[in-house]
Amino acid sequence: MAGPGAWKRLKSLLRKDDTPLFLNDTSAFDFSDEVSDEGLSRFNKLRVVVADDDSEAPERPVNGAHPALQADDDSLLDQDLPLTNSQLSLKMDPCDNCSKRRELLKQRKVKTRLTIAAVLYLLFMIGELVGGYMANSLAIMTDALHMLTDLSAIILTLLALWLSSKSPTRRFTFGFHRLEVLSAMISVMLVYVLMGFLLYEAVQRTIHMNYEINGDVMLITAAVGVAVNVIMGFLLNQSGHHHSHAHSHSLPSNSPSMVSSGHNHGQDSLAVRAAFVHALGDLVQSVGVLIAAYIIRFKPEYKIADPICTYIFSLLVAFTTFRIIWDTVVIILEGVPSHLNVDYIKESLMKIEDVYSVEDLNIWSLTSGKSTAIVHMQLIPGSSSKWEEVQSKAKHLLLNTFGMYKCTIQLQSYRQEVIRTCANCHSSST
């Protein structure tokens, strides 16, 4: 019987074979101490093909490695291998850092535009008040009042952007988003007080007609107002940006509760678009004041045009501020935002796999544009182990598809309801 020495000699003869040792399914994994380091000089645990020249490499891939790869461990990292179709089909959502960086960049640009617009509004509003006082024109002052509403809206938007960066405290765990709502109420009340004063003066002028208007000052002020509002329109106009179509096919395009149409308008902002719409309204009003000033300048006997413009512009101010009041009331009463449909959201949640029922769904707004949801769902019997997957899908649906700011999802396994009879109700019914 051969001893251990014969076995060692046999293995050493096998190691002297010129055939390279590759890592494949048929190779033996023998890492015993009996083999010296010289015997393993051509083996590296990180290499797929161990060969010093191309002649030793096989013509077919071994263990998924390309035969033309260099005999260097780092070559696998340096080469750009083509991705397969399955790898290309994977679409990863951007990480939180990327989303935050993109949001900060967008907010910075929005703040710059709105700050410039607010400064221009403030300067010209003061100029209109001075010009209206010098011309003794209520129409000019009413136009300045309308500009005050637009200035208040821009200031509230800037306040909301500033508050969004503030962290919640132990006292105010939701943050300070509702401060925007409080500021909106105060600004609207101030506008209504000033509008009431101007309407009272307009009625007195209509009745008594004992006033004179400086047509020259009124005409110059109105002309400057038209020019300023044209500048504001160009400043706040966003129609010249490039469209980046990024359609989401999670929901049908005719969904009644889609937050956006699927277009990503670059640095497009609802706040800037709202300010642009207000600027267009101011432009129309300024043109009306300019026409009235032209009439009064060349036909002083038609000075009744001044209080008439005050009546018309007061209605315009009331119409533009009514939406602010309504949105404020809905937020305070914790109503569902107008752009969301509770029934459609519930149907979308029910379409998630392994969801048995949506027991409760509450949606409200912390402030304008920041919706919050709490949902309670039951899972179908036997699917309790999939709760993480269901929770992830529901969270993605609420945050990404419907644009929620925050959401809380409660899941529980299916439990058949047990009908319980209250003793008091039973006794009263009998």
From Swiss-Prot:
One of its GO terms (molecular function) is metal ion binding. Coiled coil: none annotated. It is a multi-pass membrane protein. Widely expressed. Highly expressed in the brain and in mammary epithelial cell lines. Residues 1-113, 165-178, 238-275, 333-430 are cytoplasmic. Zn(2+) binds at residues 146, 150, 278, 282. Gene3D superfamilies: Cation efflux protein transmembrane domain. It catalyses: Zn(2+)(in) + 2 H(+)(out) = Zn(2+)(out) + 2 H(+)(in). GO terms for biological process: response to toxic substance; zinc export across plasma membrane; zinc ion import into lysosome; zinc ion transmembrane transport. The keyword S-adenosyl-L-methionine does not apply. It is found in: Endosome membrane; Late endosome membrane; Lysosome membrane. Its main location: membrane. The modification Phosphoserine is found at residue 36. Residues 135-143, 200-216, 297-311 are lumenal. Residues 245-264 are annotated as: Disordered. InterPro entries: Cation_efflux (IPR002524), Cation_efflux_TMD_sf (IPR027469), CDF/SLC30A (IPR050681). It comes from the Eukaryota. The chain crosses the membrane at residues 114-134, 144-164, 179-199, 217-237, 276-296, 312-332. Residues 240-265 are annotated as: Zinc binding. Keywords: Antiport, Endosome, Ion transport, Lysosome, Membrane, Metal-binding, Phosphoprotein, Transmembrane, Transmembrane helix, Transport, Zinc, Zinc transport. Residues 249-263 have a biased composition (Low complexity). Homodimerization could regulate efficiency for zinc transport. Interacts with TMEM163. It is linked to Defect in Slc30a4 is the cause of the lethal milk (lm) phenotype. Mice with lm are defective in zinc transport into breast milk, due to a premature translation termination codon at position 297. Only homozygous mutant adults develop dermatitis, skin lesions, and hair loss due to a systemic zinc deficiency. Pups of any genotype suckled on homozygous mutant female also develop symptoms characteristic of nutritional zinc deficiency, including dermatitis, alopecia and stunted growth. Belongs to the cation diffusion facilitator (CDF) transporter (TC 2.A.4) family. SLC30A subfamily. Probable proton-coupled zinc ion antiporter mediating zinc import from cytoplasm potentially into the endocytic compartment. Controls zinc deposition in milk. This is Probable proton-coupled zinc antiporter SLC30A4. It comes from Mus musculus.
